[in-house]
């Protein structure tokens, strides 16, 4: 199975990165249009990207400040059952982020598009956390 992997620094402490990838307020700044959920193993997240993209995920790993993983339970068929994981470690006064989107059935067109989109979204996450920049949802693909 192919995976999407990214590793990069963010110049803020792990607790801030964790909040950025687990809280609805954080997620809505860089990934979702609207979200709901709490960072606790077994909790459900609502991930809304528009009327045709009203997805759900279940928290499968949660260690505050260091790890968070969602398993997609209602999503596009290519995303169904995949897992999105953030592993965080302190580094040089900031955070080293290891991102993984695992469980893809095939390296198909949707996988290839998602590889590119994740790089873009993770860059938006970094700019949001480091500089407070907010990119409206409709303009995120242009970043």
Language-model segments: residues:
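Glycine-centered tight beta-turn/hairpin loop motif at sheet-sheet or coil-to-beta transitions
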Residues: 1, 50-52, 77-79
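Hydrophobic ligand-binding cavity/cleft-lining segments
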Residues: 1-36
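Intrinsic-disorder/low-complexity, polar/charged segments enriched in Ser/Thr/Lys/Arg/Asp/Glu/Gln
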Residues: 3-7, 44, 54, 67, ...
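Hydrophobic/aromatic beta-strand elements that line small-molecule binding cavities or substrate pockets
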Residues: 8, 56-61, 82-90
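Hydrophobic pocket/interface hotspot
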Residues: 17-21, 27, 45, 59, ...
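Glycine-rich portal/gate segments that line the openings of hydrophobic small-molecule binding cavities
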Residues: 28-29, 34-74
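Beta-strand/loop substructures that line and gate deep hydrophobic ligand-binding cavities in soluble
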Residues: 74-125, 136-138
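Short, highly charged C-terminal tails/helix-capping segments
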Residues: 127-143
């Amino acid at each position: 199975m192919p995976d999407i992997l990214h590793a990069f620094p963010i110049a803020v402490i792990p607790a801030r990165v964790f909040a950025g990838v687990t809280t609805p307020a954080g997620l809505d700044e860089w990934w979702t249009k609207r979200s709901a959920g709490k960072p606790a193993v077994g909790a459900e997240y609502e991930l809304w990207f528009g009327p045709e993209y009203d997805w759900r995920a279940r928290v499968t790993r949660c260690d505050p400040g260091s790890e968070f993983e969602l398993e997609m339970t209602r999503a596009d068929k290519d995303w169904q059952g995949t897992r999105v994981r953030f592993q965080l470690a302190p580094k040089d006064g900031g955070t080293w982020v290891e991102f993984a989107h695992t469980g893809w059935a095939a390296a198909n067109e949707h996988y290839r598009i998602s590889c590119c989109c994740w790089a873009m979204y993770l860059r938006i996450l970094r700019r949001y956390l480091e500089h407070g920049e907010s990119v409206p949802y409709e303009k995120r693909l242009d970043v």
